[in-house]
Design a protein with these regions (language model features):
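Short, positively charged patches
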Residues: 1-137, 141
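A short, small-residue-rich loop immediately preceding and capping a beta-strand
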Residues: 145-146
Length: 146
């Protein structure tokens, strides 16, 4: 079985949460396949997971993860995981880095770039939208990635 299926399973089971430290998961278990096969005892003594998360990890059905992976292959989408050499190294600086990146296009755009995230309200004022547009245009013209 492709190791990416285990990463997809882990992302699906745990979901996206700020209480999950993916850096601790990878530091302790190394990869998603090792975590999958470690079992509940090891999950508990690792100190990485709370009881609710351990309960979720006990759902070891890989069917949904396999279907997601197969859909990605069918559509020529890349699945990039932390154990891939082309996983963006800058993401490892985050304590809660993504377990799977779903890529449609060229992932190289993330390498050696200044990256900026612009966060705002769903209903910005006209002035703040204008400022955000001007800032993002200036950053991208200078070679940055938003």
């Amino acid at each position: 079985m492709n190791d990416r299926v285990y990463w997809i399973w882990l992302q699906q089971v745990l979901g996206i949460s700020t209480s999950i430290r993916t850096d601790e998961i990878v530091a302790y278990f190394g990869n998603a396949k090792a975590l999958y096969h470690a079992g509940e005892y090891e999950w508990r003594i690792s100190g990485v997971f709370n009881p609710r998360q351990i309960s979720k990890l006990n759902n070891q059905d890989l069917t949904k993860a396999k279907n997601i992976f197969d859909s990605c292959v069918k559509n020529n989408w890349q699945t990039v995981t932390p154990d891939d050499e082309n996983y963006p190294s800058m993401l490892f600086r985050l304590p809660n880095f993504p377990l799977v990146l779903y890529v449609n296009g060229d992932l190289d755009c993330l390498k050696n770039k200044i990256t900026v995230a612009i966060v705002g309200t769903r209903e910005p004022t006209r002035n703040s939208a204008c400022i955000a547009r001007a800032l993002s245009a200036s950053i991208t013209r200078s070679g940055g990635l938003i």
